[in-house]
């Protein structure tokens, strides 16, 4: 009997690995096909970003200064070399390798895009791996896991991030790695493997895009809170564990990413982020109307948030808030290729219903563990069964996890709103992509609550999950076939 059980277990593991491979391979095929079939400069600022990758390629690995004329945009007076450029370094590496076999000529930009293809493919892989731990089989059906993987991995806008030269794709990979580290902790504690994975994820995040830095901040608090509050040992031992493992996490993170910020500090007089130097460069080299001192922003125009939200530029299909929403789901090219509005509205409705339902899931945000004690008491001649809720003194790591996931949604939203109000009013949902995974987690949690309570037939419920998953996976394929190819 044990031999038979072992064989069945191994068969399930093989089937699971096959499913993961097929899922990730589908993403890779779509990303590669999309990247190879769309023309140059088909993503926001791709030309400016490609300048940096091309510079590194042509100068044999040398990194440009932010104000180098070879990478500086003549209109805006800045370059993306002020920001972390690891993504472009990987693109340059692919470009260099391609020259060993042939000269791609004008199509070299397609080779550069392969870095982004692999970043988002890697993100899909870690999302799938995380889904199994976020929605364990002891509590959820396997279809719930795949619904989350489809929502987070095959969001049309997230797929689009992997088809042109940019750093958002690396940010998605970093977020997926960190999410997997968090999810692994929930099932396995802070093992050395999970600590190192967290450190690598944070380092990659630091070298990706600034709007994803919420993942680093929340990782710090999540690690500290779960160690100090949730470990079952003396407080002194928890503190010792915090500093011993925390020191290793910090060291690995700094070793992997610290060089970039040291370089910035040396080049730009202590400006380790490069943002102040970038603004000064824009003031010096930008065309007159595009200099930060005179460029019209909502703050300078005296707009309030109602003015911003309802504003509709003559070239936009929707007002500001709707443009942000639909471009978070999927808007392509230079933000001018829209998905059918009906499809976008269906996505938004699906998200909204799922999020609202989360608030009806018991104990989702409880920071203390709770248990229910059933007692029988005599009332006259009757015996009543009374259910009492008892709040434990123990901290609930799931509740802490959910709280951090809320912050992961809020942080990029606040950063985006600050950028819109004080720097540049661009209603682009791609700036909110760091919130994708926590948002889709709550959407999945909400829909699991809805379907569990309303659809009692397990086979019917399973069918609904599968249909939704297939539709979500097909969606970006349809976007490529009907919107990009024509």
Regions found by a protein language model. Give the residues of each.
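Transmembrane-helix signature of polytopic, membrane-embedded enzymes
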Residues: 18-21, 103-106, 127-154
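Membrane-lumen/periplasm interface segments of specific transmembrane helices
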Residues: 225, 244-358, 483
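Transmembrane-helix motifs of polytopic, lipid-linked glycan transferases
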Residues: 110-138, 177, 181
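Membrane-interface transmembrane helices that cradle and orient dolichyl/undecaprenyl
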Residues: 132-139, 178-197, 205, 227-233
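Start-transfer (signal-anchor) and selected internal transmembrane alpha helices
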Residues: 1-33, 227-228, 236-252, 362, ...
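Short acidic/glycine- and proline-prone juxtamembrane loop motifs at membrane-interface regions
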Residues: 157-170
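Membrane-interface anchor segments at the N-terminal boundary of transmembrane helices
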Residues: 106-120, 310-409, 436
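Transmembrane signal-anchor helices characteristic of membrane glycosylation enzymes that use polyprenol
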Residues: 15-47, 54-65, 75, 248-266, ...
């Amino acid at each position: 009997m044990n031999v038979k059980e072992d064989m069945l277990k191994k068969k399930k593991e093989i089937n699971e690995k096959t499913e993961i491979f097929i899922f990730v391979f589908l993403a890779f095929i779509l990303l590669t096909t999309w990247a190879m079939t769309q023309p140059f400069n088909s993503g926001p600022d791709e030309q400016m970003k490609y300048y940096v990758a091309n510079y590194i390629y042509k100068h044999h690995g040398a990194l440009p200064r932010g104000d180098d004329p070879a990478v500086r945009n003549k209109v805006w007076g800045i370059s993306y070399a002020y920001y972390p450029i690891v993504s472009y370094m990987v693109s340059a590496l692919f470009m260099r390798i391609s020259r060993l076999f042939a000269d791609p000529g004008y199509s070299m930009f397609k080779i550069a895009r392969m870095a982004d293809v692999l970043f988002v493919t890697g993100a899909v892989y870690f999302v799938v791996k995380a889904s199994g731990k976020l929605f364990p089989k002891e509590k959820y059906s396997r279809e719930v896991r795949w619904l989350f993987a489809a929502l987070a991995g095959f969001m049309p806008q997230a797929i689009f991030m992997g088809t042109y030269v940019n750093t958002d794709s690396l940010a998605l990979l970093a977020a997926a790695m960190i999410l997997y580290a968090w999810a692994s902790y929930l099932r396995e504690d802070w093992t050395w493997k999970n600590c190192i994975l967290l450190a690598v994820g944070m380092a990659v995040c630091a070298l990706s895009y600034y709007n994803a830095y919420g993942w680093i901040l929340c990782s710090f608090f999540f690690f500290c809170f779960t160690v100090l509050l949730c470990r079952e040992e003396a407080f002194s031992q928890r503190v010792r564990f915090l500093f011993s493992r925390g020191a290793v996490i910090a060291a690995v993170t700094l070793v992997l990413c610290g060089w970039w910020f040291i370089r910035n500090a040396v080049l730009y007089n202590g400006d380790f982020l490069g943002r102040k130097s970038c603004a000064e460069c824009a003031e010096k080299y930008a065309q007159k109307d595009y200099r930060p001192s005179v460029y019209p922003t909502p703050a300078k125009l005296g707009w309030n948030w109602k003015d911003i939200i309802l504003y509709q530029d003559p070239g936009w299909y929707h007002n500001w808030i709707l443009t942000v929403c639909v471009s978070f789901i999927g808007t392509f090219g230079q933000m001018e290729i829209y998905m059918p509005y009906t499809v976008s509205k269906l996505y938004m409705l699906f998200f909204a219903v799922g999020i609202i339902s989360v608030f009806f899931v018991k104990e989702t945000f409880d920071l203390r563990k709770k248990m229910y004690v059933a007692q029988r008491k005599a009332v006259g001649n009757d015996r009543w069964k009374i259910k009492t809720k008892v709040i434990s003194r123990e901290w609930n790591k799931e509740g802490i996890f959910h709280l951090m996931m809320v912050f992961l949604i809020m942080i990029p939203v606040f950063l985006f709103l600050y950028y819109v109000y004080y720097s540049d009013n661009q209603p682009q949902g791609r700036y909110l992509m760091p919130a994708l995974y926590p948002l889709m987690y709550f959407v999945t949690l909400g829909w699991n609550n809805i379907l569990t309570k309303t659809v009692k037939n397990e086979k019917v419920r399973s069918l609904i999950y599968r249909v939704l998953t297939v539709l979500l996976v097909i969606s970006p394929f349809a976007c490529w076939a009907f919107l990009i190819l024509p």
